[in-house]
């Protein structure tokens, strides 16, 4: 059974910002928006602000936002996990979980990101193009949509609402 390939986001374990394992099966029954984040990107302010707005509005209806810091794009996430948490929580009042810094591309890409990319390739192939690429994952752990870094979080609200309304 252990060799069975992982077909659901819920099959993965990731590290939180303190280095503790988090089994993503704890999010079964939740709608997930998974985002690679950075503190020093031109997209940072708008994305963190809108992600926080979405989270505040829909967290009680079953939305979870999982943020994965990544330093692969323009070295725009140079801080350690503590600095990243401090930045997101103080500056943007982010209440959603921010996990351990990961690679999203290349040989050392986090297994979760390999799965996300193989489930929903981008317009120009599988690789993540920049900070704030977004993946929408349904309550069963299936990747249902991928959004470009420039897609504003509020512009996908209709997709979130639709998926929250399904069983």
Swiss-Prot record:
GO molecular function, one term: phospholipid-hydroperoxide glutathione peroxidase activity
Entry keyword set: Cytoplasm, Oxidoreductase, Peroxidase, Stress response
CDD domains referenced in this protein's UniProt entry, alphabetically: GSH_Peroxidase
Keyword Transcription regulation: no
E.C. no: 1.11.1.12
Subcellular location: Cytoplasm
Catalytic activity: a hydroperoxy polyunsaturated fatty acid + 2 glutathione = a hydroxy polyunsaturated fatty acid + glutathione disulfide + H2O
SUPFAM superfamilies: Thioredoxin-like
InterPro entries: Glutathione_peroxidase, GPX_AS, GPX_CS, Thioredoxin-like_sf, Thioredoxin_domain
Gene3D superfamilies in the cross-refs: Glutaredoxin
Catalytic center residues: 41
EC class name: oxidoreductase
Inducing factors: By salt stress.
Pfam families per UniProt: GSHPx (PF00255)
GO CC entries: cytoplasm
Family: Belongs to the glutathione peroxidase family.
Primary role: Protects cells and enzymes from oxidative damage, by catalyzing the reduction of hydrogen peroxide, lipid peroxides and organic hydroperoxide, by glutathione.
PANTHER family: GLUTATHIONE PEROXIDASE, PHOSPHOLIPID HYDROPEROXIDE GLUTATHIONE PEROXIDASE 6, MITOCHONDRIAL-RELATED
Name of the molecule in the record: Probable phospholipid hydroperoxide glutathione peroxidase
Organism from which the protein derives: Citrus sinensis
Gene name as annotated: CSA
């Amino acid at each position: 059974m252990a060799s069975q390939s992982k077909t659901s986001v819920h099959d993965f374990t990731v590290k939180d910002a303190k280095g503790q394992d988090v089994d993503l099966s704890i999010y079964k029954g939740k709608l997930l928006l998974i985002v690679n984040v950075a503190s020093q990107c031109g997209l940072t302010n708008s994305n963190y602000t809108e992600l926080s707005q979405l989270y505040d509005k829909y967290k009680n209806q079953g939305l979870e936002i999982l943020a994965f810091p990544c330093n692969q794009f323009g070295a725009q996430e140079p801080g350690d996990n503590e600095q990243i948490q401090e930045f997101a929580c103080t500056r943007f009042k982010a209440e959603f979980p921010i996990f351990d810094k990961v690679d999203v591309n290349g040989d050392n890409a986090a297994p979760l990101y390999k799965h996300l990319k193989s489930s929903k390739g981008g317009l120009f192939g599988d690789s993540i193009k920049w900070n704030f690429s977004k993946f929408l994952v349904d309550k069963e752990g299936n990747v249902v949509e991928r959004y470009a870094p420039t897609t504003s979080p509020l512009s996908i609200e209709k997709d979130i609402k639709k998926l929250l309304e399904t069983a």
